[in-house]
Curated annotation (Swiss-Prot):
It comes from the Bacteria. L-glutamine binds at residues 46-48, 103, 131-132. This is Pyridoxal 5'-phosphate synthase subunit PdxT. It comes from Koribacter versatilis (strain Ellin345). Its EC number is 4.3.3.6, 3.5.1.2. Keywords: Glutamine amidotransferase, Hydrolase, Lyase, Pyridoxal phosphate. It catalyses: aldehydo-D-ribose 5-phosphate + D-glyceraldehyde 3-phosphate + L-glutamine = pyridoxal 5'-phosphate + L-glutamate + phosphate + 3 H2O + H(+); L-glutamine + H2O = L-glutamate + NH4(+). Pfam families: SNO. InterPro entries: Class_I_gatase-like, PdxT/SNO, PdxT/SNO_CS.
């Protein structure tokens, strides 16, 4: 199974390491044509506005086509990229996930945190690393909330798309990546 990790900027290598430990064949995606080689895509954390600049209009459109039709997983900035609506400030998202997300909603870098929260994945509580994290302010009717922080969704799934506002790749817990790989294998939303 070939999994792409968008490797333009951000913490793409941490995702690569987790995915390889779980047995995936990882492609570091740096060009739009590489999207044709993969079965699923991870969009890592980083800076969403930088992703937009580096992708350009044509690259963004190729990304949008991929994430709206194939299994995709975004963390932090990647979740922003997958969103239907982005605020603080407003910017475009791919619309692959019916969420409204607020950039940097949990504060500046100094307010980053490592917290433990309940999640509905098998195994119970999960350690979650937040770094200038976005907050999901609203979810559409087809979005399943898998974990929350202070009443706000932090891990969500809709069809073939999974998003986390935290960084599961920075912990030893691989459950979120395992779920994504299951989604890719199943070609859909998978099972918990």
């Amino acid at each position: 199974m070939k999994i792409g990790v968008l490797a333009l900027q951000g913490d793409f290598d941490a995702h690569r390491q987790v995915l390889e430990r779980l047995g995936a064949d990882v492609v570091m995606v740096r060009k739009p044509e590489q999207l044709r080689e993969i079965e699923g895509l991870v969009i890592p954390g980083g800076e969403s506005s930088t992703f937009l600049k580096l992708l350009g209009d044509a690259g963004f459109e190729e990304l949008r086509k991929f994430v709206t039709t194939k299994p995709s997983f975004g963390t932090c900035a990647g979740a922003i990229m997958l969103a239907k609506q982005v605020e603080n400030p407003a910017q475009k998202g791919t619309g692959a996930l019916d969420i409204r997300v607020r950039r940097n909603a949990y504060g500046r870098q100094i307010e980053s945190a490592i917290l433990t929260s309940e999640c509905s994945l098998p195994g119970g509580e999960m350690e979650m690393v937040y770094i200038r994290a976005p907050r999901i302010e609203e979810v559409g009717p087809g979005v399943e909330v898998l974990a929350k922080r202070d009443g706000h969704p932090v891990l969500v799934r809709q069809g073939k798309v999974l998003a986390a506002t935290f960084h599961p790749e920075l912990t030893g817990d691989t459950r979120v990546h395992e779920l994504f790989l299951k989604m890719v294998r199943n070609g859909n939303s998978g099972e918990k």
